[in-house]
Regions:
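N-terminal subdomain of nucleotide-sugar transferases
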Residues: 1-58, 253
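An aromatic- and histidine-rich active-site surface loop
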Residues: 88-92, 108-136, 145-153
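Nucleotide-sugar donor phosphate/pyrophosphate-binding loop at the beta->alpha transition
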Residues: 132-133, 138, 142, 152-174, ...
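Carbohydrate-associated surface elements
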Residues: 188, 209
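Conserved donor-binding/catalytic core segment of Leloir-type glycosyltransferases
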Residues: 225-243, 249-253
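Nucleotide-activated donor-binding/catalytic signature segment of Leloir-type glycosyltransferases, i.e.
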Residues: 271-291
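Short hydrophobic beta-strand element within catalytic cores of glycosyltransferases
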Residues: 302, 325-329
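Aromatic "clamp/platform" in nucleotide-sugar-dependent glycosyltransferases that forms part
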Residues: 308
């Protein structure tokens, strides 16, 4: 089967973006042909010369050795001055038709909310259905939508909030109607979508989002904690202001005997590097290689995310897969995976440093509690790899 997986941009750190590349890898592991279909952008910056796409005849170019790590088709796109700051595809319903015909796509999977890719894909699907109903010989290409719909909108300005509410009101119902299958992370997200009168049989609930490469690394890579410290706490993800990564500097100042490891990339990376130069216990990691991240995770007594908004929370699952308890921000979907007080904790607010430190102190003083939490986390996340999700999608759209 040939599958196109559509996402706003590629990333090694942003869960809602890297999930698309993870799914491409998963389909390919199962023997299918799959491509990431995305914008010009990787981590917010152009991944190739924009002129290559602008001057292409069909509005897209294929990049075999793409920075995303998977075969990638990059399409006409821009970063308009929209309130949401989202990437926008240009003329995508036409381009998607060209891609589908050129690559013989048997399925199109579209990820994420609050951007125009899902709406354009839904319009393309609606046109094909209309043509088929009129008697045209149209290739059946199911549309799978993975909304990553998290109702706790992160809005720094009223206009941003209004834009997301309008998208939910005007665009989401149309997309849900046109999709052949909806994939959601958990029963809570399914309940949100049923408010739009989505038939239950159209919804596939799955938390299988762990990168198979990361899972293999976690299974085989030994822990390698920085020397000279009693224990390690860590964060892996985007380094931006809304992720509250400045709090790790504060934590490093408070935990003199612990290593505070921060792995990621983003606008706050340079500042964190400078802070790490004057604090031996603040360790910055810029590599996204699975073995490196696996070592960070397995060396940690606990993982944490202080984000103001995290709509997917896959990193939490990776920590749990390794048997590492996780502290989830209330504005992170990780709070839907972590059972409070069982395999991690729910922070009362996104900047709850003292609450997190009190919990870590307890884990260090009572290793039997930490080990029990770790066992429960590992049991919950066991087998939640993306290849199982890919197989479930293929089974549902083939039936």
């Amino acid at each position: 089967m040939n599958v196109g997986v559509v996402a706003p941009q590629s990333s090694h750190w942003e869960d809602s973006h890297r999930a698309a590349a993870v799914l491409v890898k998963a389909f390919r592991r199962l023997g299918h042909s799959a491509w990431l279909v995305t914008s010009l952008f990787h981590e917010g910056a152009p991944a190739l010369d924009p002129d290559l796409v602008e001057k292409s005849e069909a509005g897209f170019v294929e990049v075999e050795k793409d920075v995303s790590g998977v075969p990638t088709i990059r399409v006409l796109s821009t970063k308009p001055l929209l309130p949401t700051g989202a990437v926008a595809f240009r003329n995508f319903s036409r381009i998607l038709g060209e891609v589908a015909d050129s690559y013989g796509l048997d399925a199109v999977v579209v990820l994420s909310s609050f951007w125009n890719g899902p709406e354009e894909a839904a319009r393309w699907a609606a046109v094909r259905r209309t043509l088929a109903a009129a008697g045209e010989a149209v290739r059946r290409t199911p549309l799978v939508y993975i909304p990553i719909y998290f109702p706790k909108f992160h809005a720094t300005r009223p206009v941003d909030y209004a834009s997301k509410v309008m998208w939910t009101t005007l665009n989401l119902p149309f997309i849900l109607r046109q999709a052949d299958l909806l994939v959601v992370c958990c029963p809570q997200e399914a309940a949100e979508l049923r408010q739009f009168k989505t038939p239950p049989e159209k919804i596939l609930v799955s938390s299988n989002w762990i990168d198979p490469d990361v899972a293999e690394a976690l299974d085989s890579t030994p822990a390698a904690p920085p020397g000279g410290f009693e224990y390690v706490i860590s964060y892996i993800g985007p380094l931006r202001g809304d992720r509250n990564v400045h709090l790790f500097v504060k934590i490093a100042d408070k935990l003199k005997t612990a290593a505070v490891v921060v792995a990621g990339a983003g606008e706050a990376a340079d500042e964190l590097k400078q802070e790490a130069k004057v604090r031996k216990n603040l360790v910055f990691v810029g590599s996204h290689e699975p073995q490196v991240l696996a070592s960070v995770i397995k060396s940690s007594v606990a993982g944490v995310d202080f984000s103001s908004y995290e709509p997917m929370g896959v990193r939490a699952l990776e920590y749990m897969y390794a048997g590492v308890p996780f502290a989830a921000s209330p504005n992170s979907r990780a709070a839907w995976y972590v059972a409070n007080g069982v395999d991690g904790i729910h922070l009362n607010r996104s900047e709850a440093v003292d609450e997190f430190l009190t919990w870590v102190e307890m884990l260090v003083k009572r290793p039997e509690v930490r080990d029990e939490m770790g066992r429960k986390a590992k049991k919950k996340a066991a087998g939640l790899t993306a290849d199982k999700l890919a197989a479930a999608i293929i089974e549902r759209i083939s039936s």
